[in-house]
Amino acid sequence: MKLAVFGATGGTGRRLITQALAADYDVRALTRSQAKLPSGEQITAIEGNVLDPEAVSETVENTDTVVCLLGRTPNNPPDIVSRGTRNIIEAMDDRPVSRLLVLTSMGLGSSSKTVPWYVRIANATALHDLMADKARQEELVMQSDLDWTIVRPGGLTDAPRTGEYIHGVDIDASARPISRADVADFLLETLRNDSYIREAPVVTTRQSVEIGFLWEQTTTLARRLLGSR
């Protein structure tokens, strides 16, 4: 399998690339900092920005699957996720590449009822612009003719991969903690099994929400509000 990865140097992106290389996949990754990518003989780094259609097009070239893990940082415009996704879709439309996986968040679309009250408040206030951009991203993907899958994870942590998670569409599950490594594992399993075509599954766990997790989520929110990584 030949993957094009966008958002490759983020927490989930690095873990996905590491697991993909271990599975003997070829990876092409768009990045502004090649030093942040995992190393390997089967990874090709394309330097550039997802807002540059030519760089996006070069990344998609000679691949058969695209994984979009875009997020927003203080150095980027507030609509980078949706604008970048539009460029990705257009690049795929120009090539025989139709399989697209996109990582968004629980709390969007039909999964809005799965998040706890304090997350709903944050999404409607401090994270409103970010979630609106993610919602626009989902809309663009769903309107495309691609074989897309939108994956909505629970609260992301840096815990190790366990392989113990639950997933599905309209399942009885709430947005509990899940490691980025497990999300990466689920993304690759979805590709291998060619599952959830034109669907938006959630992926989460049955873990209890502990003080440490709440603190991690709170500090992450604070960093976003203060404009730091």
PLM features: residue spans?
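N-terminal Rossmann NAD(P)H-binding glycine-rich loop of SDR-like oxidoreductase domains
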Residues: L3-A23
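Conserved beta-strand positions in the Rossmann-like core of class I SAM-dependent methyltransferases
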Residues: A4, R28, T149
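Mid/C-terminal beta-alpha module of Rossmann-like enzyme folds, strongest
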Residues: T9, A173-R229
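Non-catalytic, hydrophobic alpha-helical segments
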Residues: T12, V66, Q137, V151, ...
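N-terminal Rossmann-fold cofactor-binding loop
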Residues: L30-A35, N49-V50
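Conserved Rossmann-fold cofactor-binding substructure of NAD(P)-dependent oxidoreductases
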Residues: T44-D64
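NAD(P)-cofactor binding segment of oxidoreductase domains
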Residues: T73-L100, A132, R136
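Conserved beta-loop-beta element that borders a ligand/cofactor-binding pocket
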Residues: E138-A159
